[in-house]
C-alpha cells in the first residue's frame, strides 16, 4: 500500500447533503449501500473472506470546515477498510474530547478493531441521520484512491453517519473507493 503522497489527516472539507434528497444520489446498488441503516462493517464482511482495518492515522486534530464548528480539537481516526487485501472504504471518525472519556467505549484502544463493532454492540450509542457527499476526480479522496492504484474515472461517493451518546454526538464518514463501487455492482447487490 503506497500512500506516501498524502499525510494524516487525509480528510478534506466536504459539502454534505441530506440523504432524503434522492435526486442527488447515485444509481443502485451503491445508493442502497449509502443509505444502509445498519453497520457498514457487517455489510462489508459479508462480501469477503478476509476483512481488515488499516490505520492511516489517529490523534488530536483541529476539525475541518463543516466539522464541529465549536471545537478547537477532536480525536480523528482515519482508516482503510479492506476486503481480501483490497481497500474499499476510507473512513474518517471524529470524536469530541468529552466522548473520549466515556467508560462505555475504549476509542483510544481500538487498534485494528472496526469501530462499527463497538458502536453497534452497545445500546448507549444510537445511530442517527445519514448525510451524503460526492467527491470530484481531483479531490484528496481521489488522490488517495490513485495512490492505492485505483483508477478514478468519475466522482466518488460517501456518507456521514451520526451517533448519539447521551447528550453527545460523534460521526463517522465512510467514502467508497473505486474498487468498492465496481465490486458492489458485481458481488453483493
Curated annotation (Swiss-Prot):
One of its GO terms (molecular function) is chorismate lyase activity. Its EC number is 4.1.3.40. One of its GO terms (biological process) is ubiquinone biosynthetic process. Its main location: cytoplasm. Substrate binds at residues 77, 115, 174. InterPro entries: Chorismate--pyruvate_lyase (IPR007440), Chorismate_lyase_/UTRA_dom_sf (IPR028978). Keywords: Cytoplasm, Lyase, Pyruvate, Ubiquinone biosynthesis. It is found in: Cytoplasm. GO terms for cellular component: cytosol. It catalyses: chorismate = 4-hydroxybenzoate + pyruvate. Pfam families: Chor_lyase. Pathway: Cofactor biosynthesis; ubiquinone biosynthesis. Belongs to the UbiC family. Removes the pyruvyl group from chorismate, with concomitant aromatization of the ring, to provide 4-hydroxybenzoate (4HB) for the ubiquinone pathway. PANTHER family: CHORISMATE PYRUVATE-LYASE. HAMAP family: UbiC (MF_01632). This is Probable chorismate pyruvate-lyase. It comes from Shewanella oneidensis (strain ATCC 700550 / JCM 31522 / CIP 106686 / LMG 19005 / NCIMB 14063 / MR-1).
Amino acid at each position: 500500500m503506497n500512500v506516501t503522497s498524502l499525510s494524516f489527516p487525509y480528510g478534506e472539507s466536504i459539502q454534505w447533503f441530506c440523504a432524503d434528497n434522492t435526486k442527488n444520489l447515485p444509481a443502485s446498488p451503491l445508493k442502497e449501500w449509502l443509505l444502509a441503516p445498519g453497520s457498514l462493517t457487517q455489510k462489508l464482511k459479508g462480501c469477503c473472506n478476509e476483512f481488515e482495518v488499516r490505520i492511516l492515522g489517529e490523534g488530536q486534530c483541529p476539525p475541518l470546515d463543516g466539522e464541529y464548528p465549536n471545537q478547537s480539537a477532536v480525536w480523528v481516526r482515519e482508516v482503510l477498510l479492506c476486503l481480501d487485501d483490497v481497500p474499499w472504504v476510507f473512513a474518517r471518525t471524529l470524536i469530541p474530547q468529552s466522548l473520549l472519556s466515556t467508560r462505555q467505549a475504549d476509542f483510544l484502544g481500538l487498534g485494528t478493531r472496526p469501530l462499527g463493532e463497538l458502536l453497534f454492540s452497545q445500546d448507549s450509542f444510537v445511530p442517527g441521520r445519514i448525510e451524503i457527499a460526492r467527491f470530484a476526480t481531483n479531490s484528496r479522496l481521489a488522490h488517495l484512491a490513485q495512490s492505492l492504484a485505483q483508477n478514478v474515472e468519475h466522482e466518488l461517493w460517501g456518507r456521514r453517519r451520526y451517533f448519539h451518546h447521551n447528550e453527545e454526538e460523534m460521526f463517522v464518514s465512510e467514502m467508497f473507493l473505486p474498487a468498492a463501487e465496481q465490486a458492489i455492482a458485481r458481488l453483493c447487490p
